[in-house]
């Protein structure tokens, strides 16, 4: 009976002990400013994606004309948006690393967006150049990488928008 009594006493004693209260996490004013910049800049994400996909598809179907310039300008806008949001997002992610509330959501969002960052850079590098031949292969590769990157970024965006805590 002694081992059973000891096991029951240990089990009940473990239940009586309360866990330490969660530590408060305090964010800096700079965190709040970066979060606001990140959030407001993010409003441009989906409209830029829609514009770029429409321009890219039009250019894919009928190469040439002013569409190429417009496509490059919108692409530069996406690159600029992602530069700003990568800096503000990573910086805030580092500051929020000790806050357990919403950690998984922030991590999933961050990983998806960093993967999209890499994809957008690869998209830029894979842009077709009609002067050096193999135009059709390059544009297909460029398109595939771009659409994959947009999908990753949209998933990351929606994770923060609808992901809950």
Please tell me what each predicted stretch does.
Residues 1-73, 81-103, 163-165:
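N-terminal targeting leaders of membrane proteins
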Residues 40-54, 76-91, 108-125, 144-161:
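Membrane-active amphipathic alpha-helices enriched in small hydrophobic residues
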Residues 67-77, 102, 106, 136-148:
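Short, charged, amphipathic alpha-helical segments
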Residues 124-141:
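Membrane-helix boundary connector in multi-pass membrane proteins
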Residues 59-63, 76, 129, 133:
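Charge-rich, low-complexity amphipathic helices
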